[in-house]
Amino acid sequence: MGKDTIADIITSIRNADMNRKRTVQIPFTNITENTVKILLREGFIENVRKHRESDKSFLVLTLRYRRNTKGSYKTFLNLKRISTPGLRIYYNYQKIPRILGGMGIVILSTSRGIMTDREARLEKIGGEVLCYIW
């Protein structure tokens, strides 16, 4: 069986977020790099660094926390893996769901690369739904 890198990213971020860790390390692949770039662009992650130890590369993510009078609270509300290696889920651009009326994002793998639901609707292309973030 192959490894599900998207599920690994989601689980690592969710676990670090629940434990109030400031940074998390994930293995480097092209899919993880493109997914993390989307998270950085959308404001869910504060910083990303590529790090190399001996022959292995990985990304170090700095999670973003907001401050209020009662202390810090998390930016991620929920992350959910949709399409799995055993059950692929595809949508055309008209059927891509809107998460919380557009407040959340859907990350898609399309023929033009990994992108958000808004970008896919603008370019009028569909693809495999990787995950929901809201």
Swiss-Prot record:
Subcellular location: Plastid, Chloroplast
GO molecular function, one term: structural constituent of ribosome
Keyword presence, tRNA-binding: no
Entry-linked InterPro entries: Ribosomal_uS8, Ribosomal_uS8_CS, Ribosomal_uS8_sf
One cellular component (GO) term of this entry: ribosome
Short name of any one Pfam family annotated for the protein: Ribosomal_S8
NCBIfam families reported in the protein's UniProt record: PRK00136.1 (NF001109)
Record note on quaternary structure: Part of the 30S ribosomal subunit.
Protein name: Small ribosomal subunit protein uS8c
Native organism: Lotus japonicus (Lotus corniculatus var. japonicus)
Gene responsible for this protein: rps8
